[in-house]
């Protein structure tokens, strides 16, 4: 049996110019954020690209040439900070600095957001990396950890206990230690009954093999961990033999389920999904309201309007507003030739036009 970790490289390696197949999400990997207009300022200055933030790694690729890309696993990151950098596309600006170490080689990456004033580049990468760092219990073998509280296993998010077996001997010493054995969907945990701090947590991610072997204590459950976790060989004595066999079957079954869909424990949700640029664009609305008509303006009436004296205009305004609520007003308004602009000057001229259209020009001297 191979551990999931033997095939897992995404969070434990730094790679350049990876294939499209390697850029795809592996089982258990989730895309958390996607940022366009990101520049790899140190390696590809002046080249606009896209940054993918997953629960295991950060991927950058050029938009013009997708084969120009890089992948940075969170386990390789030593430090993340923000500094000022010189970008060909934005000039001097704040950038995200990521210092990594992989196979005794250090790499430094500088990413610049080409969208002015957007903090998503910093918040997404830094927050997801922090979530990765605080969820190592899902992925790392842990000895003498704070696992037990009031004789109960402290469950991780999304973790479920499938079996709890009392009276299990840990065979790490000559005389053995009596304790309690937990089988969950994420890991195997054992702790001593006399001392809760004497314990071990073995994630399925780190398990290389699960077998029943003979020992000086009789048949025992033997778990071999991956080389990355130290290559431990841990033995547990479970009685009776039938219970031992059932436990091995259950662990192997849960290990297969986990291998098909691993739970890496990196949980992070964007508080607000980024909006498209089109959604952020607000259409300008004019203050004036126009009602356009299909018919042409009556040239005769317009010529008569130009001959009305100031005194006559005032009389017409009074007549119009005293009859505003009569039936002809609404009817005339809807038959208006031309346009209405709701301001103090043009509305008076339009009302005058309505009145003359309905009553002729007999008041004009």
Swiss-Prot record:
It is found in: Cell projection, Cilium membrane; Cytoplasm, Cytoskeleton, Microtubule organizing center, Centrosome, Centriolar satellite. One of its GO terms (cellular component) is ciliary basal body. Transmembrane segments: none annotated. One of its GO terms (molecular function) is phosphatidylinositol-3-phosphate binding. Keywords: Cell membrane, Cell projection, Cilium, Cytoplasm, Cytoskeleton, Membrane. InterPro entries: BBL5 (IPR006606), BBS5/fem-3 (IPR030804), BBS5_PH (IPR014003), PH-like_dom_sf (IPR011993). GO terms for biological process: cilium assembly; intracellular transport. It holds the Pfam family BBL5. Part of BBSome complex. Required for ciliogenesis. Belongs to the BBS5 family. This is BBSome complex member BBS5. It comes from Xenopus laevis. The gene is bbs5.
């Amino acid at each position: 049996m191979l551990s999931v970790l033997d095939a897992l490289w995404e969070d434990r390696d730094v790679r350049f110019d990876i294939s499209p197949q390697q850029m795809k999400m592996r089982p258990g990997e989730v895309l958390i954020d996607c940022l366009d207009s990101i520049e790899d300022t140190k390696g590809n200055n002046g080249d606009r690209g896209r940054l993918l933030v997953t629960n295991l790694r950060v991927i950058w690729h050029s938009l013009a040439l997708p084969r120009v890309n890089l992948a940075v696993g969170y386990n390789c990151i030593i430090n993340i900070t923000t500094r000022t950098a010189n970008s060909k596309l934005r000039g001097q600006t704040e950038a995200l600095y990521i210092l990594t170490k992989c196979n005794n080689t250090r790499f430094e990456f500088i990413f610049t957001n080409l969208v002015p004033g957007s903090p998503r580049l910093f918040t997404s990468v830094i927050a997801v990396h922090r979530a990765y760092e605080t969820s190592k219990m899902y992925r790392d073998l842990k000895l003498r950890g704070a696992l037990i509280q009031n004789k109960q296993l402290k469950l991780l998010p999304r973790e479920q206990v499938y079996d709890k077996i009392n009276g299990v001997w840990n065979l790490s010493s000559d005389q053995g230690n009596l304790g309690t054995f937990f089988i969950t969907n994420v890991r195997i945990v054992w702790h001593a009954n006399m001392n809760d701090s004497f314990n071990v947590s073995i994630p399925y991610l780190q398990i290389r093999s699960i077998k029943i072997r003979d020992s000086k204590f009789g048949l025992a459950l033997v778990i071999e961990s991956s080389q990355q976790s130290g290559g431990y060989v841990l033995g547990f004595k479970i009685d009776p033999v039938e219970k031992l066999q059932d436990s091995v079957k259950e662990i192997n079954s849960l290990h297969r389920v986990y291998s098909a869909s691993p739970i890496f424990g990196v949980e992070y949700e964007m508080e607000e999904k980024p909006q498209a640029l089109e959604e952020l664009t607000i259409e300008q609305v004019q203050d004036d309201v126009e009602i356009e008509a299909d018919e042409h303006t009556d040239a005769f009436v317009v010529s008569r309007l130009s001959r009305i004296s100031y005194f006559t205009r005032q009389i017409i305004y009074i007549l119009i507003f005293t009859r505003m609520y009569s039936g002809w007003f609404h009817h005339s308004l809807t038959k208006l030739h031309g346009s209405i602009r709701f301001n103090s000057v043009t509305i008076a001229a339009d009302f005058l036009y309505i009145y003359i259209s309905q009553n002729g020009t007999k008041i004009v001297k």
